[in-house]
Amino acid sequence: VSGSLLLNIGEALARHIDDPDRIKYYAQELKQNTYNLTRMNLVMRGIKPDNIVTRNADTLEDDWPYFEDNDPENTYEPLYLDAVVSNPPYSQKWDPTGKESDPRYARFGLAPKSKADYAFLLHDFYHLKPDGIMTIVLPHGVLFRGGEEGTIRRNLIENNHIDAIIGLPPNIFFGTGIPTIIMVLKQKRDSTDTLIVDASKGFVKSGKNNMLRAGDIRRIVDVVAARADVEKYSRLVSRDEIRENDYNLNIPRYVDSSEDPETWDIYASMFGGIPANEIDALSPYWEAFPGLRGELFDVQPNGYAQCKDDPAAIVNGHASVLEFEENYRRAFDGFGDFLHEHLVSRCETVKVSREENLLTQDIFTRLDGIPLVDRYAAFQMLHEQWTTVSLDLEMIQREGFDTIRAIDPHMVVKKKNGKDQEVQEGWEGRIIPFDIVQKTLMPEQVKAVAELEERLEQAQFELTDL
C-alpha cells in the first residue's frame, strides 16, 4: 500500500461523520520504502499521528494482532475493523505449511501455494467486524479456478459472505495489464444473492492505460448500493443459480455486456431508404419527443422510410422538442441561487467533504423525469469543476476570507541558454481568475479591448497583403 486506498476510504467515511479525527488508519506493508511512503502520505494529508498504526511486515506470515511492540505477549488482542480495503499482489506464491489451524483460514480453507489471492482475502476478512464491509482487488481467476480456490469460494458463498463482484476495465493499474475485479464481502448479510456487475466498458484512454472516470465510479457505487438489475451492466444472482453453475462466478456467465451485432439491410443498400428497424432502435427519442418521428420520415409503400428535407429545422421547431427544452429549463430554475447559498454564502463554514454529494443529489433530483440525459455524464461535469471548487473552499477556510482578494506571481517555464527556467509573467488571482473579475465588473471595457484587438488583427492582416 502507499496510503491511497486508506485515504480514499477515510474521505468516504468522513462524509458521514462530524469528526474525521474519529477515523483510525491501520496498514501493513512488506516493502520498507512503500511502508515509509504510506506513513508519509497519511501525515501529509492531515491525518493525526495518533490515528496512524502501520507495520512493516509480511501479512501472510505475521498476522495483525493488536499489541504493544514492547510487550507483544501480554498485550495481544485481535484487531477488528469497520472497513477493510486491499489491493494485494496478484497470484503471489506463499507457504501454507502449518497454517491449517490459523484462525484466518480454518473456516474456509488454505489457498494453494502457487496463488495467495485467497490467503490475502481471508486475512482481510478475518479482521472485519460483524457489521463491517470489505473490498479487495483481485485477478479474474479467483472467480472460476478450481481446486483449493474452488473450495474456499464455495465456502464463502454457502456462508453467505460474497456481497458483490465488480468487473473492472482492463489495464487500469500502472505496471500490470492483468484484468481485475473488486470483490465486496460482509460478515453478516440479510440476503443470500450476489450482485454481479460488469463495469469493464466504462473508461477512457489515458496514455497507455485505461482510466475510470468519476462518473464511471459513481455509476458502480449507485448500482451496488441499490443492488440494482441494469441491462448489460448488473444482475442479482441467486445462490441457487450459483450452485447450479458449480460455484463458478465468472462474470460473463451472469451478465452479457456485449454490444448488439451490427446488421446491414441489403435492400436499403441497393435501392435506398431507411429500414424501419433502424428507426425503431431510436425508440427512447420517439418516446421523449411524441410526434417527431412522423414529422421526420415519409414511409414508402415498400415499408422503407425517407428522411424529409431540412431535418434540423424540423427537430428544432417541433413542439415536443420545445416542450422538452422548457421542462429542462424549469427543472434547473433556482439552481444558481442554490449554488450561491451553498458555496458562496457559506464558503467559510461549508463541509467540503460532504458538499459534492449534496450537489449531486440536487442535480439528480432535478433530472428525475427528464429523459435522455445521462445523470452520470452530468455528475462527471460536476466532479471536474468540483476538483477546483473544493480546493478553493479549503484555501478560504484555511487562510481566511481575504485570500479571495489575494494575487500571486504567474510563473511560467521558459528556455534560457538552452535550459528550462521558471520566470514570472505577470500576476494571477489566487482564488478568482482575472478574466472573471474583468467580465463581471468591467464588461464594457472588456468589450472595447476585444474590439480594438480585433481591429489590430485585421490591420495586421491587411498589411501582410500589401
Language-model-derived ranges and their functions:
Residues 1-83, 91-95, 102-106, 119, ...:
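Conserved S-adenosyl-L-methionine
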Residues 84-85, 134:
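Hydrophobic beta-strand segment of the Class I
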Residues 112-185:
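Conserved Class I SAM-dependent methyltransferase catalytic core
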Residues 251-283, 422-446:
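Short, exposed interaction patches on small structured surface elements
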Residues 286-288, 293-466:
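Terminal accessory regions of large proteins
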Residues 18, 26, 35-36, 40-76, ...:
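S-adenosyl-L-methionine-dependent nucleic acid methyltransferase catalytic domains
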Residues 174-271:
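Flexible, glycine-/basic-rich loop-and-beta segments that form/coincide
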Residues 2, 32-33, 60-61, 89-92, ...:
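Conserved nucleotide-binding/hydrolysis micro-motifs of P-loop NTPases
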